[in-house]
């Protein structure tokens, strides 16, 4: 219902997609809608089951889940039907991942309201994916702008609860996870900046008792970590001045506000800690420009490139 169909329509026409075996999962009429908006067309083979897919001569496949039904979805409008369609396509992709039939997932922007209307009971798609893939280890969301990565110790919790979670073990987990993910994306020996919790990294006890010990421990394991950096200057030090390759922060807004200020229109989300690379553009469904062929392809293209690189490198391990 948003800008997703036109973005997928444009992405499939990009030359870099020829470097992978492409399977698009969704309803055919939705892609047709996207093509009508974008003015693009593709040479796709349409199938109704995965078993019908045979990759040869650079073919790209569309796995049609419509089951012969021609559903109509209103542009820029949330609905139970569109939410169900998104959940069905996502769950099918995750099933294929569990069966080791695919190597990565790159999805367009989701509308959380429609997904909830369609039956999603999870707070976000990451937790849905983790449950579906039976993930028991630590997982978290990475955000990427211009190949600069971020991860956080806490995410969608009240700010009043954040200090309770700032523990050495909790800080080590995202540091290790983002370090491994960036190496998989081709960044050797990533320079990891770790944010403080308190103003100027000194008005509190968390830096001394938890954050610094966490940094010291990961450094012993060979991770190139640095900090704690004061939140208010961390993005200038790490991102703008190019002194680091990523930042690990203690809470949501300390990271998101800085990253979005530098590149909200170029952001990519990587789902960290899952058994295969899963990426998406960081923006939403943008109902205000849906259907107008104004959607910027760059975040979607970058998210595809990251998924492709990580999958290629993972296959070499």
Labelled PLM ranges:
Residues 1-317:
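Anion-binding alpha/beta catalytic cores of soluble intermediary-metabolism enzymes, centered on
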């Amino acid at each position: 219902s948003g800008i997703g169909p036109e973005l997928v329509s444009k992405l499939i026409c990009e030359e870099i997609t020829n470097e992978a075996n492409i399977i698009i999962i969704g309803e055919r009429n939705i892609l047709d809608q996207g093509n009508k908006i974008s003015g693009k067309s593709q040479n796709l083979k349409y199938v109704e089951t995965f078993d019908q897919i045979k990759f040869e001569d650079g073919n790209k496949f569309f796995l049609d889940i419509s089951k012969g039904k021609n559903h109509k979805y209103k542009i820029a409008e949330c609905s139970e039907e569109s939410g169900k369609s998104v959940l069905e396509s996502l769950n099918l992709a995750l099933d294929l991942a569990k069966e080791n039939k695919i190597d990565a997932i790159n999805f367009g922007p989701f509308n959380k309201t429609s997904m909830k209307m369609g039956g999603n009971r999870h707070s976000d798609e990451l937790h849905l994916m983790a449950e579906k893939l039976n993930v028991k280890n630590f997982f978290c969301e990475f955000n990427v702008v211009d190949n600069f990565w971020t991860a956080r110790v806490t995410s969608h919790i009240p700010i009043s609860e954040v200090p309770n979670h700032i523990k050495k073990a909790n800080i080590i987990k995202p540091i290790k996870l983002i370090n491994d993910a960036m190496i998989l994306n081709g960044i050797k020996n990533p320079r990891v900046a770790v944010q403080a919790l308190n103003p100027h990294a000194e008005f509190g006890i968390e830096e001394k008792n938890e954050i610094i010990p966490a940094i010291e421990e990961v450094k012993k394991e060979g991770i190139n970590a640095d900090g704690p950096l004061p939140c208010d200057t961390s993005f200038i030090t790490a991102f703008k001045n190019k002194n680091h390759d990523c930042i690990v922060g203690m809470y949501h807004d300390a990271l998101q506000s800085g990253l979005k200020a530098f590149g909200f229109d170029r952001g990519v989300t990587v789902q960290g800690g899952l058994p295969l690379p899963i990426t998406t553009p960081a923006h939403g469904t943008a109902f205000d420009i849906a259907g107008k062929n104004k959607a910027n392809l760059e975040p979607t293209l970058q998210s595809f490139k990251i998924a492709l690189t990580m999958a290629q490198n993972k296959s070499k391990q």
